Curated annotation (Swiss-Prot):
InterPro entries: DUF4680. Residues 87-109 are annotated as: Disordered. Pfam families: DUF4680. This is Uncharacterized protein C5orf47. The gene is C5orf47. Residues 87-100 have a biased composition (Low complexity).
Amino acid sequence: MAAAGRGREQDSARFVYVTRFGSHQCSGVLQLGGRGAQGLWGQGPGAGCRQEKPREAMAVAGVQGGSELPLGSQLRVPTTPGVEAAASASSQLRASRVQSGTRQSARAGLIQKDAAKKYDFPIPLNEASKIMKKKKKVLVWNRVYKVISRMLEENEKYRHRLKCQRLSSESSNYTR
């Protein structure tokens, strides 16, 4: 009965919305732990939970903050040929560099995501030892629980066998 309750608790906290991962803006839903964990772009049971893509998140942040749109989404219309056209071309080149930088940071984010999968979720180092101790305690308790339950089962079987022996000896006394 207790195991079924624990399973429900784990299911309720399997997804976490993350706005940053280290220095990278990722704005997504992470699926935590277990065998079915797929991370940011998982195909698992949490695939129905959509996340914002980094560019969309930046655009939303720009709108909410009241600031301008990101460089990649600004309109570039040269007013006069010559200097403005060159400036526009350089700004477009800069914008493409920014976009390629976001792609590189997304790749770096994937590397960090893979590293996070290894440990279920990125955590500060000062909290890591506490969490590891807690996990060890849980693992030890699970083993102890199994041993205790086996002992109780054996005890019940032994009691049942003794009870049957007593009944059979009493019934044999009556038949004599």
